[in-house]
């Protein structure tokens, strides 16, 4: 089974970098990208992804609020990973508060971290 991934970030260079990480990770495929929190909620409903890579700081509603909205309206279980340039100690707890499965600093986002986070989150389903 291929994991359907949606990338949410307002910075095009990071969306491109995240796409490269996802596409080089076996069993993962990018199905869509969004630039704002509002757009991510609409697109998640339309595309029905398995996994959302969500930036914390977004124009309009922020990543944690968009995460809550996506989880409230999802048709099935969606795993959301929060990503940001902030340190894990600062934002790790916020990930849990909004329902995200994990927080990954952008500086350590890699195919290995993606696969590990997905495995951990999907094993608790």
Language model: regions and residue ranges:
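Active-site residues of response regulator receiver
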Residues: 9, 55, 84
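The feature encodes the CheY-like receiver
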Residues: 14, 59, 88
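Short hydrophobic/Thr-rich beta-strand motif most characteristic of the beta2 strand and flanking loop
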Residues: 27-35, 43
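Acidic catalytic/metal-coordinating carboxylates
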Residues: 36-39, 62-65
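The short loop immediately C-terminal to the conserved phospho-acceptor aspartate in CheY-like receiver
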Residues: 50, 56-57, 82
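Short amphipathic alpha-helix used as the core "switch/output" element in two-component signaling
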Residues: 64-76
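Alpha4 helix (beta4-alpha4-beta5 surface) of REC/receiver domains from two-component response regulators
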Residues: 65, 86-104, 108-116
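A short, hydrophobic beta-strand element within the central beta-sheet of small alpha/beta folds
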Residues: 77-87
């Amino acid at each position: 089974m291929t994991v359907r991934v949606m990338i949410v970030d307002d910075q095009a260079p990071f969306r491109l970098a995240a796409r490269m990480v996802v596409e080089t990770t076996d069993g993962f495929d990018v199905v869509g990208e969004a630039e704002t929190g509002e757009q991510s909620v609409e697109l998640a409903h339309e595309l029905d992804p398995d996994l959302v890579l969500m930036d914390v700081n977004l124009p309009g509603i922020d990543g944690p609020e968009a995460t809550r909205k996506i989880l409230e309206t999802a048709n099935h279980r969606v795993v959301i990973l929060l990503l940001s340039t902030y340190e894990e100690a600062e934002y790790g707890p916020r990930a849990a508060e909004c329902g995200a499965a994990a927080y990954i600093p952008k500086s350590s986002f890699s195919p290995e971290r993606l696969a590990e986070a997905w495995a951990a989150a999907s094993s608790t389903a």
